[in-house]
Design a protein with these regions (language model features):
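Aromatic-residue-lined binding/catalytic grooves and analogous aromatic/hydrophobic interfacial grooves
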Residues: 1-330
Length: 330
């Protein structure tokens, strides 16, 4: 097998829960790809979308109890030291990381056959392919650090691809549509309780001090007819469509740049990091990744899966943290 065959996660069905989705990211903007047919969902996150606003949440009275806690520790009275610290030295809870929302692609075709989805770790691309109504549909997704955007290429072997694009979010936002794409503008709540504390009446406070944000879904190229209506885009009679998703930061999309050019720049940038390490623990098994995991749980041997798991961890770190952005938050 060549290296590309070794470094991919692939499946013969769409994700049915979040843990099965395919993640892509450029350090600041990420997507979890469900791979549904005919209804695709991209769960979107942006690194700076938190509840709250900039303020000092340290406990000003903590210093007064510091010496007492140190004394109790020196006396090996650790339980008492912990109780004093928890009662008098802790600050307020931190705020909550929030999802940007979901991009929905609803295709108008019949049941899918010959289904496959994959995450290529060598090129940092995700792909979904299947057949429906006698035509072959393919989708490719990548999160480009140079372009500061998520790129989506949709193709159909016949010029009859029809779909509706829409955006949904749990945040307070408004979506507008024109023939160029979708425009999303919103505001994060000024407070959201962390999920690990008990529910209380004011667990979520929208207020006016939360972070404001914007996002765009642009139609970069394609054929067919694109119409905007009621905050959605409708596409009919297409064989090819390229989208760019951006949030908070303006994307770097040179005028006239083709998808292929943007894709090559993405792969070149990503591989400068990913290609620093190789690991070979044996040949790969020619079966979907979820079946390989099931065999391993039943006591089977699959050394190649451990190597894939190692490289998947490296892929996730590259996807979630890049220069100029925030550290990975998980």
């Amino acid at each position: 097998m060549n290296r590309t065959d070794r470094l991919r996660l692939w499946y013969e069905r769409a994700a049915s829960r979040w843990e099965e989705t395919l993640p892509i990211g450029n350090g600041s903007l990420g997507a979890m790809i469900w791979g549904g047919a005919p209804c695709e969902v991209l769960g979107l996150n942006e690194e700076s979308l938190w509840s709250g606003w900039q303020r000092d949440r340290n406990n000003p009275g903590a210093r007064a109890h510091l010496e007492e806690v140190r004394r109790l520790i020196r006396e090996e009275r650790y339980g008492e030291a912990e109780a004093v610290a928890e009662a008098h030295m802790l600050g307020e809870y931190g705020e909550s990381y929030l999802p940007l929302g979901s991009l929905h692609l609803a295709f108008k075709h019949g049941p899918a056959t010959d289904y496959m989805r994959e995450l290529d770790l060598e090129q940092a691309t995700a792909r979904v392919a299947y057949t429906a109504d006698g035509a072959t549909y393919e989708r490719e997704y990548l999160a480009s650090f140079p372009a500061r955007a998520i790129l989506v290429r949709l193709t159909c072997s016949q010029p009859r691809m029809a779909l509706t694009l829409s955006f949904e979010s749990p945040l307070s936002c408004r979506t507008r549509a024109d023939e160029v794409g979708l425009i999303i503008e919103g505001q994060c709540p000024e407070h959201v309780d962390p999920p690990y504390i008990p529910d209380r009446p004011e667990a979520v406070i929208q207020g006016e001090r939360g972070r404001r944000f914007s996002a765009r879904v642009r139609v970069l190229s394609g054929d067919g007819t694109v119409r905007a209506r009621d905050g959605r885009l409708s596409v009919d009679g297409a064989s090819r469509l390229v989208l760019a998703v951006s949030a908070v930061r303006e994307p770097e999309l040179p005028a006239g740049a083709s998808y292929e050019t943007l894709r090559e720049a993405h792969i070149r940038d990503y591989r400068a990091l990913f290609d620093r390490v190789e690991l070979w623990l044996g040949p790969q098994k020619a079966m979907p990744t979820d079946r390989r995991l099931a065999v391993l749980r039943e006591g089977g041997e699959d050394p190649g899966l451990y190597a894939l798991y190692f490289q998947y961890g490296r892929y996730l770190l590259i996807a979630s943290s890049r220069p100029g952005g925030l550290p990975a938050n998980l």
